[in-house]
Amino acid sequence: MPKKLVPKDYEYIHLDLTTGEINFTSFNSLEELQASLKEGQIFFHKSVIFEEKPESGEIYSPKLISQIYRKEQELFEIREKSKGHPLPVTKKLLKRGQGTIVCCGIYTKELLKNVAEKGQYDTQCDDLNLGIFHVRAHKPLGIAQRLVHLPLPEDASSAAVATENLFGLIRFILVNDPAKKKIYLPISCFAIEKRIEQEHIIGYSQKDSLALSQRAYYEYKKDGTLIGLVALIGVDVKIDGKLGFLYHPVWREKQWALKFNEKMFYCAVSRAEKEKVFKPPYYLEPTAIIVDVTETPVKRLKNTSEDYLWLEVSQISAKFSLFCAQNNLKLEKADSKNKSPFVALSMESISELTGEQKRAFVKILNIPGIIFSSSTLAKARLESKLQYIGPALIEAAADGNFTDVVDIINRIEPLYDYKEILKEALKTQRLGTGNTPLQEAIKGQHTSLVKYFSSLSASLKVINHKNHQGLTALNFATAIGSSPAIVQELEWCSQ
């Protein structure tokens, strides 16, 4: 039997750049680690959980680790000069439409380069063929955030997600092997101070598109039992009486952390702290994470097949309560003993609403804390004449990544019937008239939309938008990848 390797606190991988030798070493504290650093040496945190020690040391490639280290050093220096301000870093490292994403490389054979420019990149993992990395850029209030989605095989029960931090370095690659033989939790340098207990994993349900927009993941036991939610920026983890803390390098203080165990999860942020931490330009949309969640009965979490929308009582108007009553939406109050300021609304019941009802739902509940919408849509909901899909489409078009059209539709599907929206757009001649391929695409799957746009000839020129001829100038601008023309046509469509 292979020897089971369990990581210890402050156990690091030591890389000697001169010899290329890789060893494991432990320190009693970060201060001891820093004091021992010498030129030409790298220590990076061995925050990886696996059941068998790999036979080959290739996953700890010296070249790969050194590249990660240099990127970490660059980010650290910029961060120190900017005194923790994230914007100078994003401007330097994540220019619109281009950039380099560096993967931590554990169980991944190669770096991901120029992913944002190409839009997709093929890679291969040791044990699971994870397919194509789909890269999407989000820029809520000027802060760049990229998500890389790794779809598992069709028979997999969950998907793996790699998430870059705000500085463009992938911090997490979370893989849940459906066979439950191995669990990989590779994380790059200094991402975790304390380990997570081996019997727990962080998983992302493929049916749950919320995890992407929230930048949070449901936390499961290996047997599939739901424990709670895990935030990416800061998390206090308490398991079997042991407390650990996962943190984002920007927010080193424990001012914002979701705490959870098998009975409850809650946010440790007071309103005063939230206003201090999230004030502009540091502000991250409340949609990016669940905030101000107080103690919640475990019975709300046991049914893993159904998700709940949590709403603060103070945000619920009489008009919204009436809407829920008229449309059989049951607002479930938390245990009165806990005096929770939240109520729960079943996501399944929301999904059963018609397109018209969903739009009315969002219009009535016009609050920034609605957790299942993207930050872009939450920020610009109903403010654009394009309505609903317009703001996100403009953002996607500006980045020149047109697979985002499908991604956007997937993300807002819990709110809006995309077929109904596009049919309405066709009626108003915004996305084409007549029996166009787009109409045929509407009848098919989401991917048909991308096939439709990509099928247009790249040699076609942008025509006058008043002369549609069955296709709008937006379609042509999309086909030739002209971002300025796309934005111009989207703005025209909104008039």
From Swiss-Prot:
Q: How does it sit in the membrane?
A: Single-pass membrane protein
Gene Ontology CC terms, in alphabetical order: plasma membrane
Q: Which UniProt keywords apply?
A: Cell membrane, Membrane, Plasmid, Transmembrane, Transmembrane helix
Recorded protein name is: Surface E' protein
Do you know which InterPro entries this protein is assigned to?
Ankyrin_rpt-contain_sf
List residues traversing the bilayer: 224-235
- Supply the PROSITE patterns for this chain: ANK_REP_REGION
Where is this protein localized, as stated in its record? Cell membrane
Lineage, top-rank taxon, reads Bacteria
